[in-house]
Regions:
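Soluble catalytic domains of enzymes that build or remodel membrane lipids, polysaccharides, and related
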Residues: 134-325
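N-terminal signal-anchor transmembrane helix
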Residues: 90-145, 150-168
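Non-catalytic terminal accessory segments
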Residues: 1-121
Length: 326
């Protein structure tokens, strides 16, 4: 839990710093002077009020975390805009009459956040064809991860995605973690599991845990535990694999790993060598491992295919580069 307190403290500190910067940035803007805020004190008061009003409006309209994300986008782009326009002004030899840097930052923030919202609420099917010398024959797999039920779409939206999966006519459906989220309600979890139970496949549906499925907070807050989730999944014919493997049709293995977050919770999980050491290496092995951070060991253990989630499409620069270090 210590890491989460550290993250919370950093988030609060960065948010406060961002609000102070934005308040000062608004106070210094030529636009503020045009509103009749001539004195320094009145400008600062206006800047602080505008920054707090903007942040509060975002928090009430979206939620607190999304308000923080929007604030940081605006702050970073304001800093970048001020830097670029300072260079231009240096060569221009005279100040700008309008706050072009601020306007550019707002427009770019709006464009970036709108694009993010659109991508977050629209799901695309990506097709991959994988060839292997092993005798597995044709196998049609549907994989999904990070549905985080209730976060970007509700159970009705999830049911629509299930229908799209069914139209792919899969031999098997694999879920690589974060099926539910810390904010998912018990009823949403139950309805989503029922939707999974409607899938018609040759070999069934298999699930491996992600870092959010068991929840980071008090189970009472969302109304169910990790064990409750397992019960509902099994009730709907979903096979849950936790450091376990199963041989299917004497052709291929599905190996589901415990998530890396189990280690952070003080719980053990098997190494890749331990998971694969007793398997027939002539048969194709498919690993479900939510967090893609163990590729070297998976290669050494001679895993054939590793399927993961967690990165949500790579996230944003530069955080995507930082994540590659861990």
């Amino acid at each position: 839990m210590l890491i989460w307190y550290i993250i919370l403290a950093i988030t609060i500190a960065v948010t406060c710093a961002g609000l102070l910067f934005l308040a000062n940035r608004i106070a210094r803007s030529p636009f503020t002077a045009k509103l009749g805020q001539e004195t320094s004190k009145r400008r600062k008061i206006f800047g602080a009020a505008a920054a707090v009003f903007l942040f509060t409006a975002l928090a009430l309209t979206l939620n607190l975390m999304n308000a923080v994300i929007c604030l940081l986008h605006i702050v970073v782009l304001c800093l970048a805009g001020d830097f670029v326009f300072a260079i231009i002004q240096h060569f221009r030899k005279q100040p700008f009459r309008h706050d072009y840097a601020g306007m550019a930052a707002l427009l770019l923030s709006l464009a970036a956040l709108s694009t993010g919202w659109y991508l977050d609420h629209h799901v695309w099917t990506t097709n991959y064809t994988i060839e292997t010398p092993k005798k597995i024959k044709d196998l049609r797999i549907v994989l999904f991860a990070d549905s985080h039920i209730g976060t970007t779409f509700d159970t009705r939206g999830f049911a629509e995605h299930i229908s799209e999966m069914q139209r792919q006519n899969p031999d098997i459906v694999l879920i690589a973690g974060d099926f539910v989220d810390d904010g998912t309600t018990r009823q949403q979890m139950i309805e989503a599991c029922r939707a999974l139970g409607s899938l018609q496949t040759t070999y069934g549906v298999y699930f491996a845990f992600g870092n959010h499925d068991k929840g980071y907070h008090d189970p009472a807050a969302r109304g169910f535990t990790g064990d409750d989730l397992i019960t509902e999944l099994k009730k709907n014919n979903v096979k849950v694999l936790q450091d376990e493997n199963t041989l299917i049709d004497n052709r291929f293995y599905i190996i589901g790993r415990k998530d890396f977050s189990e280690i952070l919770r003080g719980n053990p999980r098997q190494s890749m060598n331990e998971l694969l050491q007793n398997l027939n290496k002539e048969k194709f092995s498919i690993i479900l491992d939510h967090q893609p951070n163990d590729y070297n060991n998976q290669t050494d253990a001679e895993a054939d295919l590793v399927l993961s989630g967690h990165t949500h499409g790579g996230q944003l620069f530069p955080l995507n580069k930082v994540c590659l270090l861990y």
